[in-house]
Amino acid sequence: MSSFYHGDALELSIFGQSHSPAIGVTLSGLPAGFSIDMDELGAFLRRRAPGQNAWSTPRKEADLPDFLSGLVGNVTCGAPLCAVIHNTNTRSQDYNNLIDIPRPGHADYTAQVKFGGFQDVAGGGHFSGRLTAPLCIAGGICKQLLHEKGIEVMARIDAIAGIEDTSEFLAPVDRKNFPVTSDESAEHMKAAIARARAEEDSVGGLIRCQITGVPAGLGEPMFGGLENKISQLAFAIPAVKGIEFGLGFAAAGLRGSENNDAYRVEDGRVVTETNHCGGILGGISNGMPIVFRLAVKPTPSIARTQKSVSLSAMQNAELNIHGRHDPCIVPRAVPCVEAAATIAIYDALKASGI
């Protein structure tokens, strides 16, 4: 099972399962001598933590990182960093029927085929969204490193169940427990989530991310492009099913004269009048904000009866899912998107020597 990110300057590994004693991360390539603000890291992790509100899973976990190596005090020492989060609130018996009857929309069946039935199905095992907690440890640390260089990564909910945030701008929402710019839109989204839960269903949505302060010239052409790096890490978030940069797919319906971002000189630097390209051309940053959106699917674990198969009998079957699940994972995925983007940008920045 390959849960490794082999970057240009960073090496990242995520380990554990949703109901194993612990989940964790190893991260190599951090500079020695950097002091981690543990309060800030804790606040970042709490944005993703479960069991905090009505639109989250009832499973409660403290998600406190326990650092095993890589730090002396709170300062990086140059050794690989390793941190774990202990799982303390599991109910593995809720998942016993999934060994034979896989969940539609989840990785149960593909994991069964890949690993011959030896996979851990409890809580989704290694395919669970729970594994984004250690991703956020790595991302939270890289976020502090980027902040020192004047680079900020900020994401928000762009839409849930087809209900869009009314603002096109990314105002700071990291202190909100429901990260939407418009409070009115937030209430409509919460209502849609509540309706889905009452109907034993779930909803998905869109997340918008913006990265400011990235200098022009970062990234490589073709396989080493910034879009490639961000996408690779973003798809480590289990619910992500699509990504677009700038106008993305909407650009396909425009003419070149409409899509092209006109250049001009402003305060001694080259800028663009629009940002349809999302701040990246040819895989390389152009100095404008990097903007992308992610599509997040509805949570596949829903309470209503679903059609599936019995793998032991090789016949059609019905599935009733037990356990504790999010009716919408989008709000908790927002910091995960920030984490993925932050790791990608810091890796490219460190490798470039900028």
Regions found by a protein language model. Name each.
Residues 15, 21, 200-203, 207-316:
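Glycine-rich anion/phosphate-binding loop at the beta-strand->alpha-helix junction
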